[in-house]
Design a protein with these regions (language model features):
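N-terminal accessory segment detector
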Residues: 1-50, 54-76, 82-91, 95-101
C-alpha cells in the first residue's frame, strides 16, 4: 500500500513541478528545493547531470514503513517525469541521487 501511495504522489507532484520549473537539471533541482526545503539540514548538490538531495526527514521517525517503501516509490515516479534515474543513498540522513539520462 505504501508503494502505491508513493507512486501516485510522485507522479502527480512531479507533473506539477515539471509545469512549474521544467524537466531539465535546473527544473529537477528547483523542484526538489521547492518540495523538501522544510527538512531539517536540507541540502542539494548538483554535479553535472546529477542532483543529490539530503535532509533529516521526520517520516522515518513517525511512519517508518512508509519511509522504507513509499519514499523510494515516490522518488522513482518523481524521477521518471524528469527522465532521470534515482537511487537511495542513505536513510539517515534521507539522501537520494537523481541522474538525468
Amino acid at each position: 500500500m505504501e508503494e502505491s501511495i508513493g507512486r501516485f504522489l510522485g507522479e502527480v507532484i512531479a507533473r506539477r513541478m515539471v509545469e512549474k520549473f521544467g524537466n531539465d537539471i535546473e527544473g529537477l533541482k528547483n523542484s526538489l528545493d521547492y518540495l523538501f526545503s522544510w527538512e531539517r539540514d536540507f541540502k542539494l548538490e548538483v554535479e553535472g547531470n546529477t542532483v543529490i538531495s539530503s535532509g533529516l526527514c521526520p517520516i522515518k521517525r513517525f511512519y517508518p514503513r512508509y519511509c522504507e517503501k513509499g519514499c523510494l516509490a515516490f522518488a522513482e515516479k518523481f524521477a521518471e517525469q524528469f527522465k532521470a534515474k534515482v537511487e537511495r543513498v542513505s536513510i539517515d540522513p534521507c539522501t537520494f541521487k537523481f541522474t538525468l539520462e
